[in-house]
Regions:
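N-terminal export/membrane-targeting signals
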Residues: 1-21
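N-terminal presequence-like segments and the immediate start of the first folded domain
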Residues: 20-313, 318-367
Length: 367
């Protein structure tokens, strides 16, 4: 009897040890999958590009709001494939978390990752809102028969940072209307308008003014810095092209809009394909650091068969006026000086890297 009991005990112990060893082995072999990095550049069909802006939410903190924005986006694009996201983040949340959540969400849905730009702003138009996203997606069918129009930010400024923003927005939108008309497009062709403001105190009035002119467009409004050095309203836009330009890209500087040797006011893109990039950050504050950022951007474009000489529109996100001047100086070494791209540049609050002085993303023509 004692022998039988010992054999039973030994068997039970062996089973227990085997089970524990197997469980331990399984635990040891589990590997935490790191989020995939978004691509640095993507090629997309110009005639199928559509644009969305996520609604603001005050529910939860940055992570929840980012998840909710992505959920809304994936349910509101009508089957279009998201190829680019630009996220504006307000508050003290970690901007790097946005990148992680974008990667997780698209991977969970078995969708290709879009290129991504993340920029910190001073404030958003809803209290407690921490993120808003702009989406560029490829629709199932063509929606832009002749291509797209990208309009540079039309800036209006006042010296004092607390000056009211509504008169400045009125000036900016008047110039935007001039640009839309000069491109041969109508207000109903405008697909997205983004207004960068020094203050949101008069946001409701500014929004009503934009909505009255561009009712069918996706609209976005952000306060660029918490404590700007001067008052500003600068609205940029993307619109559908209404006529065949006969060229892949055509720069315009129409009468009524101040010309600049640094950038074009309007770019008409008739090319079948464009290359969209995520933001490339300059790590450091010296000219050499700025050049390295543009060199990395060039490599990203080259992987898709593009070049910085073929950039049609550039969005730059410097963190100070001094850095803005640096970007103006250095970018001329890389862009086509005879035909500089359209674009928007004004100081923002922050970037994902603490060491970054500025970031830049572009739309380039793929000929």
């Amino acid at each position: 009897m004692r022998r039988i009991w010992l054999l039973a005990l030994a068997g039970a112990l062996a089973v227990t040890l085997s089970s524990w060893g197997k469980k331990k082995k399984e635990e040891e072999t589990q590997v935490l999958q790191l989020p995939k990095d978004p691509p640095s550049a993507i090629t997309a069909e110009t005639r199928r590009l559509v644009f969305h802006v996520t609604p603001l939410s005050a529910k939860g903190l940055l992570s929840q709001q980012t998840r909710d924005a992505l959920k809304w986006l994936l349910h509101s694009t009508n089957g279009a494939t998201v190829v680019k996201l630009r996220a504006f983040v307000s508050g003290s949340g970690d901007l790097r978390r946005v990148r992680e959540l974008v990667s997780e969400t698209f991977t969970e849905h078995k969708l290709p990752l879009p290129v991504l730009s993340v920029v910190q702003v001073g404030a958003l138009p809803l209290e407690l809102a921490q993120v808003v996203m702009e989406s560029t997606a490829v629709a199932k069918k063509p929606v832009n028969d002749y291509g797209l129009v990208y309009i540079s930010g039309q800036g209006a400024y006042a010296a004092e940072p607390l000056d009211p923003v509504l008169p400045l927005a009125t000036q900016s939108l008047a110039r935007l209307a001039t640009a839309v008309k000069a491109a041969g497009s109508e207000p109903g062709d405008v697909a997205r308008v983004t207004c960068f403001l020094s203050s949101l105190d008069q946001f409701a009035a500014v929004r009503r003014m934009v909505e009255s002119n561009y009712a069918g467009a996706a609209l976005n409004f952000v306060q660029v810095q918490r404590a700007p050095t001067h008052a500003v309203a600068e609205c940029e836009a993307v619109a559908r092209l209404r006529w065949n330009t006969g060229t892949a890209v055509h720069m315009l500087n129409p009468e009524g809009l101040e010309p600049s040797p640094q950038f074009s006011q309007i770019v008409l893109i008739g090319a079948p394909k464009v290359i969209l990039t995520g933001s490339q950050e300059a790590f450091g504050f010296q000219d050499a650091d700025a050049r390295l950022a543009f060199e990395r951007l060039q490599k990203s474009l080259a992987q898709e068969g593009g070049s910085l000489h073929e950039v049609a529109f550039a969005s730059s996100y410097p963190l100070s006026t001094r850095i803005s001047e640096q970007v103006r100086k250095i970018r001329g070494e890389f862009y086509d000086r005879a035909h500089p791209p359209a674009g928007t540049m004004l100081p923002f609050q922050g970037l994902p890297s603490m060491d970054a002085g500025f970031a830049v993303d572009v739309v380039a023509v793929k000929e």
